[in-house]
């Protein structure tokens, strides 16, 4: 039995009522969408986050189908730079529906936590700007919530999609077997659901793979090999901090999709939250950091010598050392935090990117180098932004965003003056168009008879006293030329050949 289409696509949920599991998140999605029908809600975007294959993307498309909304989707296969996101999602968030009705357009940004690298430069920063100004609902889909910047998360409603339970997968797979006219026992479906590890999409793919060429499936037809699963970092941290067995804590890291370079930051951030919070446990905290320091030495040798065999010793020290350093196990719930080091590095990187982006605009505008624009001209343009006479023209000429204006002026947040100047520049851009605008230092010529002796400002700046003297001398020495009926044919030179 050959299939030209994957069952995952063929039986994709057409409505939110068809979504398997995560009923609470589905209800919250519907309530958020309903709030758009009565105006613009406070939170204009939602984040659907959770492991792969649990129905996040399907839920977003089903929501649009239930409300008869158009959809615009950007996923990992698309280039998602700041320009692309602003051109596609930004324009879509402002324009009306293609049908001309008042129906909304749902903007879906899949794998939003994977916007990084040179291919997607500036994309993460553009998302925040679009969410702030959008008139259309936006859905961000992510496997790792902390892969999104804190500024973006603060603008959104966070809805978690958990792994689908096996007993919820079985009815969905049974309906597929009925539609495909395949005889299949409940034991087979239970085995497929168990091996999927909460991933409904993988379970359906496994079912299709087993059913290919068969009309009946038996338990013997299912491969006994188990699917590779990845442990959540939060589960691993719980085993490290709550366990009393160093071996189990170390084995928990084997299925973790994190390097020792990253794991040590997680342990470093959450060690004070777990140890040292109660009286008499300060020694546990000190001992734990001593083991982390030893692990960090091995990581330093890895970076210096490129000897990745030393990772095993670093991993053992940071996990087993954390376990043996505690004198008693805390039983309360602890909310583990992502490393603040990453957040600070991300903020510094964002500032550097903004600085270089502004310097690039100034360099193009002033015809200077990036380095000179960054070190010498940036503060001058910042001063001009504080002058009412030039501020709107500078903003218009450089096409500055509000965040770039805040950075140039050295303010900590958007002020009323910055917002007013940005609005004036935007109004000028809409009325004139970018190509018709004049540079802020150029004045429009008056409608009068041109004077041969009068030079405009650009000529005055570019001319030198020596050139003026030479030009004047040549003008005095050249005799007047008599007008003739036909112009003399210019003499050819070697360069004409």
Curated annotation (Swiss-Prot):
Residues annotated as binding ATP: 50-57
Query: What protein is this chain from?
Result: Replication factor C large subunit
Q: Which residues form the signal peptide?
A: none
> InterPro entries annotated for this entry?
AAA+_ATPase, ATPase_AAA_core, P-loop_NTPase, Rep_factor-C_lsu, RFC_lid
Q: Name one GO molecular function term.
A: ATP hydrolysis activity
Annotated region (Disordered) at 428-497
- What gene is this protein translated from? rfcL
State the UniProt keywords alphabetically. ATP-binding, DNA replication, Nucleotide-binding
